[in-house]
Amino acid sequence: MVSYKARISLSGTEHRVVDRVCNEIKEIASRTGVEIHGPMPLPTKRLVVPVRKSPDGEGTNTWDHWEMRIHKRLIDVDADERTLRQLMRIPIPDGVQIEIQIKS
């Protein structure tokens, strides 16, 4: 049977949802008996947008700061075709982006 190395990178704005998908991937890997490394948390990217509170530009300069955090996880899986097929069937929530790189 052919074995592949898959690198799965997950990113999303809510860390609990990203961790839930990571746990599903870990469960599939343990059920099929393949080796897994991770999830490795990558640095959280913090995006801040300062916006003026006053719509007309008059008065004192008061600002609102809107923030969005992007959480990332990285998982390496030594998988066979059956495991990869099961990984493709995982329901991914709307707020999570997933990228799978496969090396043979």
From Swiss-Prot:
The keyword Ribonucleoprotein applies. PROSITE patterns: RIBOSOMAL_S10 (PS00361). Involved in the binding of tRNA to the ribosomes. The gene is rps10. InterPro entries: Ribosomal_uS10, Ribosomal_uS10_CS, Ribosomal_uS10_dom, Ribosomal_uS10_dom_sf, Ribosomal_uS10_euk/arc. Gene3D superfamilies: Ribosomal protein S10 domain. PANTHER family: 30S RIBOSOMAL PROTEIN S10 FAMILY MEMBER. Keywords: Ribonucleoprotein, Ribosomal protein. This is Small ribosomal subunit protein uS10. SUPFAM superfamilies: Ribosomal protein S10. It comes from the Archaea. HAMAP family: Ribosomal_uS10 (MF_00508). Belongs to the universal ribosomal protein uS10 family. GO terms for molecular function: structural constituent of ribosome; tRNA binding. Part of the 30S ribosomal subunit. One of its GO terms (biological process) is translation. Coiled coil: none annotated. GO terms for cellular component: small ribosomal subunit. SMART domains: Ribosomal_S10.
